[in-house]
């Protein structure tokens, strides 16, 4: 069997369908459950998009009208999202996890309680931000994460999951701090908007939107390190899982689950069914009855593994193969 648990939720599979455009579609959500998904993360409610819609209204001439319309815009977006949560819970039995993509603490935190009321099984906070200021006090970036989690945990009693970026100086310390403030799990890692440049038109374009297997290396490394250092917080790997092997690698590194979007977008819901089948066959061939039997077997808790995971230079590697 491939049953597991993550953030206190029971999953029939370690495959969590990650937030993407398809998880805003109730028919697709039902299809993913039938294919064998362990849980669904709904398409993120973007703090940024709500604020942008409000800003586009303008408020120079009629401030009272602006206040009314801005309230309507944000309420409409949130109400539609709450309806999606309720419908998904009505149609599915697996955990439904709404996602808020945010970069600051503020009014949006009130949405969290309403999502819980709509039936959410857990809440994913996708903290997306870049720290680029020259005037920067050490730890400010991390403190934003802590404040967001503290505020949300006060409002809900469902598990809070935090999806973080890889752009932190000490990811282990951040995960430890998030757990201390009430987070039940972390997802390693979110992905910033991919930017590219068209050298003919001299314009910005969208870079590679979907992940590839090469993207798996970084979250694997940190899953192996964090699961050994902060074993009390659950981990999910996100980015680069394109086959059952990526799932097995993630669990061996210490992740209890994986969030997958790109592979499912490319291949459809059948990818979930096939990956589940092949993962279970591999488990049986290795003598494992369930993911918990090999969870973290290759994390940094073993000195031999720690040496490999903490290696940052290529020199020793090349000297071994030449």
Regions found by a protein language model. Give the residues of each.
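C-terminal extensions of enzymes
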Residues: 266-286, 292-322
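Macrodomain-like recognition of ADP-ribose-binding/processing modules
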Residues: 1, 63-68, 77, 83
């Amino acid at each position: 069997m491939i049953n597991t648990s993550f953030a206190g939720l029971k999953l029939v599979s370690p495959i969590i369908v990650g937030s993407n455009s398809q998880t805003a579609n109730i028919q697709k959500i039902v299809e993913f459950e039938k294919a064998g998904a362990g849980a669904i993360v709904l398409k993120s409610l973007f703090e940024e998009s709500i604020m942008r819609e409000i800003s586009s209204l303008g408020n120079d001439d009629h401030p009272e009208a602006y206040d009314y319309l801005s309230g309507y815009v944000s309420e409409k977006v949130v109400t539609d999202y709450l309806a999606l949560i309720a419908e998904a819970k009505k149609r599915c039995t697996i955990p439904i996890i709404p996602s808020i993509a945010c970069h600051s603490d503020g009014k949006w935190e009130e949405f969290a309680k309403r999502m819980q009321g709509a039936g959410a099984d857990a809440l994913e906070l996708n903290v997306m931000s870049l720290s680029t200021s020259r005037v920067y006090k050490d730890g400010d970036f991390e403190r934003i994460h802590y404040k967001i989690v503290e505020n949300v945990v006060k409002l809900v009693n469902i598990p809070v999951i935090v999806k973080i970026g890889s752009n932190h100086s000490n990811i282990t310390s951040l995960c430890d701090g998030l757990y201390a403030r009430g987070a039940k799990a972390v997802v390693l890692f979110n992905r910033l908007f991919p930017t590219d440049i068209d050298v003919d038109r001299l314009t910005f374009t969208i870079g590679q939107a979907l992940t590839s297997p090469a993207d798996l290396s970084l979250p694997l490394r940190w899953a192996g390190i964090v699961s050994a250092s902060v074993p009390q917080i659950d981990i999910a790997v996100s980015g680069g899982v394109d086959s059952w092997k990526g799932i097995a690698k993630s669990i061996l590194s210490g992740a209890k689950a994986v969030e997958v979007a790109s592979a499912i977008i490319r291949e459809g819901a059948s990818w979930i069914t096939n990956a589940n089948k092949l993962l279970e066959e591999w488990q049986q061939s290795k003598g494992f009855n369930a993911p918990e039997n090999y969870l973290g077997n290759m994390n940094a808790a073993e000195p031999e593994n720690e040496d490999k995971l903490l290696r940052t230079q290529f020199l020793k590697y090349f000297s071994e193969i030449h």
